[in-house]
Amino acid sequence: MAPHTQQLTTAPATATTVPAVQLRGLTRSFDGRTVLDHIDLDLPAGQFTALLGHSGSGKSTLLRAIAGLDHEVVGSGRLTAPERVSVVFQDSRLLPWRRVLDNVLLGTEGKEAAAKGREALAEVGLAGRERAWPNELSGGEAQRAALARSLVREPELLLADEPFGALDALTRIRMHVLLRELWERHRPSVLLVTHDVDEAIVLADRVLVLEEGRIGLDLVIDRPHPRSYREPVLGEYRERLLAALGVTEDVD
């Protein structure tokens, strides 16, 4: 089946549009069922992209393919990604037998590693918690530590698979602000997988909708940051994305 993409708004070509990630004809199948269907996609260097879709649409499969974590699936196509890739999941995946700083430094080497780890923890608001155990952290603090762990590797590409899905509403808003600030400071390419349309609109500069294993909508959010949920124009983007997801809202 041929891929199809609907581009509602096109960003002007700039030096930053050099692809950090490039997919050509990417296909992935499980038990004879096609989950990703010949996807062609470019993610420019430094772009913040969000990926929406129903459960089972292939969002996490696409992220895992880009991360190189899908060795046991049947697939084809061409995939190019940067060498330095960090992944943040919904579960912080902190090792309970290691202190926070040791978790952040896991897999890193060099004399400056500890200093970089402390700096990363300070960036996410966890200065002074280096010696804490993971079970002493709140859910939001654990995700902050996970972000610090990703930052210390100085990634060219940050993949985030519903990182705030288990957090309460207020903590999610705070984490939205933090993630955007970290992106503006470090400028990695970001691919954020989420079920939350509002989260995608507030954070991302481009939103993709995955539908039956294909990119059904490719929408550039051409609005300055910081953004407010109350902006009327964001409501227009929201309606387009919900329509692409097959959701309609009744307005009184």
Regions found by a protein language model. Name each.
Residues A67:
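Helix-to-loop junction immediately C-terminal to a conserved catalytic motif
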Residues V21, L36-H38:
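Conserved structural motif at the start of ABC-family nucleotide-binding domains
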Residues L158-D161:
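Catalytic Walker B motif of ABC-type/P-loop ATPase nucleotide-binding domains
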Residues L52-H54:
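The feature captures the beta-strand-to-loop junction immediately N-terminal to the Walker
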Residues L147:
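Hydrophobic anchor residue at the start of the ABC signature
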Residues W133-L137, E141:
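Conserved ABC ATPase signature
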Residues V152-E156:
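A short, proline-enriched helix->beta-strand linker immediately N-terminal to the Walker B motif
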